[in-house]
Amino acid sequence: MGSTLATHFVKLGAKVILCDRDQQGLVDTYWRCHALSDQVAYFHLKDFSPESIETLLDMVEQKFERAPDVLINNLPSAPLPSLVDEKPSEQFIQQLAAIASSLFNFSHACSRMRQRQTKGVIVNVVCYNTVQDRSGIVSANSMVSGFTQSWAQELTPFNIRVGGVVPQIASANDEIVHWSEMREELIRNTEYIVSNEYFSGRVMSA
């Protein structure tokens, strides 16, 4: 999903900066985008800690002489343990903490940089890649919805908008057909939020 989002915005003429912990996937996406435009760069992150993200944004600002106008947080959902599992608590806490920390650390660092400039937008996008990953979608959607609304209230005085895009839950019967359509809708909704200067504090469903 992240690769598809990146190539979509490259086709629209945007200058795109890619970052991820998955180095091979990151490089593959870079070359896919680079075949369409030379206005693309990538940075490999060892983790999503505040220090790593601050270093990344410092390098971006040095290379491009400005902070990013748009931050798209792409969050793949993962299956969460059930309440009836034998020992679900540690896995559940780790997975939710990973989602929350990456969301918060990126958004916090970018919003601080944007406050020194004119305006910006943060879009939190939830997706899933397999049928098994759907079990975590409700929790991920709820988390993104809450963060999006509260952060929009905090950042409105700084002219920074925050929006969210989340998938609806599909039945197993139409999973194959639905995912292709839903991915296109997620991308369209993300583009809409980026381009609509009056959209903030809300979440769109695909």
Residue ranges and their predicted role:
Residues 12, 63-66, 81-82, 105-118, ...:
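A short helix-coil junction within the Rossmann-fold of NAD(P)-dependent oxidoreductases
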Residues 1-17:
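Canonical Rossmann dinucleotide-binding motif of NAD(H)/NADP(H)-dependent dehydrogenases/reductases
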Residues 101, 157, 164-165, 176-206:
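C-terminal helical subdomain
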Residues 36-39, 56-73, 79-80, 161, ...:
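A glycine-rich helix->loop->beta "capping" turn
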Residues 33-51:
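Rossmann-fold cofactor-recognition segment
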Residues 76-77, 85, 91-95, 102-104, ...:
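Catalytic loop of short-chain dehydrogenase/reductase
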Residues 48, 94-102, 181:
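Glycine-rich NAD(P)-binding loop of the Rossmann-fold in SDR/ketoreductase-type enzymes
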Residues 14-28:
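Conserved glycine-rich Rossmann-like NAD(P)H-binding loop of the short-chain dehydrogenase/reductase
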